[in-house]
Amino acid sequence: MALLLLCSQLGLNAVPALGVESALGILEIQLTDHREAIGDFSQVKLLIEKILLSPRSGLQFWRTGWQEIAPSSDSIDLTQLTGKKTARIFRGEIPPGAFDAFNIKIKTISAVLKKTRRSASIKNTVGPVKLAFEVPAQGETLLVIDLVVTDFSDHPPQGYELAIKGYELYTNGKLVEKIPPE
């Protein structure tokens, strides 16, 4: 009898655990281009290798390193993303949590100049960005990353460079942080 009571108690306690799977949050990452030297190009295609997130370890000091997520779109053309246009590179459910940084790993950049219709070299200077953000359970976090192609050709031997100009961070539709501020 005691065993039956114990088994039924364990069964009842296991039922709420089934709902834990739905406690995921949604993370969306978009790219846009800040209009500077992008007008020099007819095409600037980025091949995105992976997206990395750095979980905030807090008291769980063993939880260090980068969490890798695969981009949903691996190739984008920056010349199509001027103004308010964006390209979604990831949208998906992930376990809720706090993060300290993100990194967009770009595998290749292929560019074609408008004037000469020749390929041009663009140096990739995109690297890790320190940014504290959270993905809440059953909530939505949107990160819009503003990339910029800058022309340094008036300072030889430099040429064009790709970098992060800023970002906008939204949680559940509300703007949380914007760099640079307007």
Labelled PLM ranges:
Residues 1-5:
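Sec-dependent N-terminal signal peptides
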